[in-house]
């Protein structure tokens, strides 16, 4: 495997594993420097790159597929992992370092996957590692929020898994756009599973409940990946699905109204995530080239400015 087709997600997962076992004196340089290799790997990926791996029953896993859409999301995810790694250098919690990097690597795994099996594997790994990021705060509130987060994402993950099972059973192994139909059971199961991750109203309560309960580092990683990976999946699979316009508008208005009424800075920013993701979802629903480019650009910039806001709001009250 050359640098030109090295999976950046694998690099970040390796960083997490290293951080889990090395002493703190070595963990800091690992978190600060090694994620930059992932960023370098993204920069060397050429459009059209497609790495595969043989699987059971003649199935081929397309675990590294690069086009313009996957590349831009992979770029911002690696940038965020590198920035977050530098910020996390002060942290003595090795489990948080492991989960944050594995979480980011899993997000890249979903982004660069071209087949359903790879997508669901990394999606579930994202859910597991993000759960432990919430629990890393080790407070009663974070434990309770984590259990609720677990229940919601188990439900959403099972919906997504059931939809993917139907697609794979029908011989459809590759991730393809579904907006043009048929709007069958698999369509609705996959759409609902991804919508939960995108915090589409009324499936959004887990975000406002869980994100404020994480550590500062954990909250920044949480805000950067789960909903944005879901937006990527919506663009990839459901672009032009009309009803997403109305859900996006509802999210934008609902999140903004509740953010105005909040006096807890973390909860305010969590509602603001719902609102801003609503604009992205509405763009996906419109489905035009300009709307999809706008949703992608908004996701890119939102990760950057939201992380800055969360880095500067460690206190529980504004």
For every predicted segment, state its role.
Residues 83-94, 101-119, 128-313:
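Hydrophobic transmembrane alpha-helices and their helix-loop junctions in integral membrane proteins
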Residues 12-15, 63, 72, 104, ...:
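Bulky hydrophobic/aromatic packing residues
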Residues 1-98, 172-173, 177:
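Transmembrane helix-loop-helix hairpins at membrane boundaries of multipass inner-membrane proteins
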Residues 314-318:
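A short, hydrophobic C-terminal helix/tail in secreted or cell-surface proteins
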């Amino acid at each position: 495997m050359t640098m030109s087709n090295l999976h950046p997600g694998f690099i970040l997962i390796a960083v997490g594993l290293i951080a889990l076992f090395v002493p703190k004196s070595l963990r800091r340089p690992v978190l600060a420097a090694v994620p930059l290799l992932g960023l370098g790997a993204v920069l060397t990926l050429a459009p059209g790159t497609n790495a595969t791996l043989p699987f059971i029953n003649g199935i081929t896993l397309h675990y590294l597929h690069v086009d313009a859409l996957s590349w831009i999301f992979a770029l911002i995810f690696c940038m965020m992992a590198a920035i977050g790694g530098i910020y996390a250098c002060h942290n003595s919690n090795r489990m948080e370092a492991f989960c944050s990097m594995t979480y980011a690597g899993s997000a890249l795994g979903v982004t660069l996957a071209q087949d359903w099996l790879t997508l669901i594997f990394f999606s579930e790994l994202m859910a597991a590692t993000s759960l432990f990021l919430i629990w890393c705060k080790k407070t009663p509130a974070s434990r309770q929020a984590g259990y609720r987060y677990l229940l919601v994402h188990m439900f959403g993950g099972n919906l997504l898994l059931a939809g993917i099972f139907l697609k794979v059973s029908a011989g459809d192994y590759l991730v393809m756009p579904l907006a043009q139909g048929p709007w069958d059971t698999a369509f609705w199961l996959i759409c609902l599973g991804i919508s939960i991750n995108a915090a589409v109203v009324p499936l959004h309560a887990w975000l406002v409940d869980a994100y404020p309960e994480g550590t500062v580092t954990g909250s920044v990683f949480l805000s950067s990946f789960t909903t944005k990976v879901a937006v990527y999946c919506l663009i990839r699979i459901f672009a032009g699905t009309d009803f997403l316009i109305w859900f996006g508008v509802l999210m934008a208005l609902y999140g903004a109204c509740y953010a105005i009424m909040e006096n807890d800075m973390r909860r305010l920013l969590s509602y603001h995530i719902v609102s801003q993701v609503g604009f992205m979802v509405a763009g996906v629903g419109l489905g035009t080239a300009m709307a999809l480019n706008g949703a992608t650009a908004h996701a890119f910039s939102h990760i950057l400015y939201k992380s800055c806001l969360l880095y500067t709001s460690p206190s529980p009250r504004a």
